[in-house]
Amino acid sequence: VRLTQQALMAMADEDGLPLVGAIAAGQPIEAIENINHMVVPEQLKTDNPCYVLQVKGDSMIDAGIFDGDWVVIEQRSHARNGEIVVALIDKNNATLKYIEQYPHETVLIPANKTIKPMRFHPNQVEIQGVLVGQMRSYQHR
């Protein structure tokens, strides 16, 4: 999921951010932009361009990120080891995971003991952004 900085700034208003689709917290899913708009509390935004994704799956449950939650992502192409990132794998599939980067390997680590880490050559993984906030609805639909 990659929007230009101009597109993100144009779509963000005082309270809202672009809601650009879903992110896998499980098996990676195809990265598709489906842009809507979502009101986001000021405390969940940063000074840099941000966007919102809805979580699909249970690979991050031990980090308190559940299926159906909305995550606020700061768009950037770098992250520190241990941060939760939106990772684009092979320029096609996106997932939300902890990241550990080494010279010859990038490891995407779930927060669910039943799911194994995914290991890739660094050229296969592109960081699309870093988690900076989260929202949840307790309404059953």
Q: Which residue ranges define each predicted feature?
A:
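C-terminal regulatory/effector modules of DNA-binding transcriptional regulators
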Residues: 65-141
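Short, positionally conserved secondary-structure boundary motifs
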Residues: 1-61, 66, 94, 101-102, ...
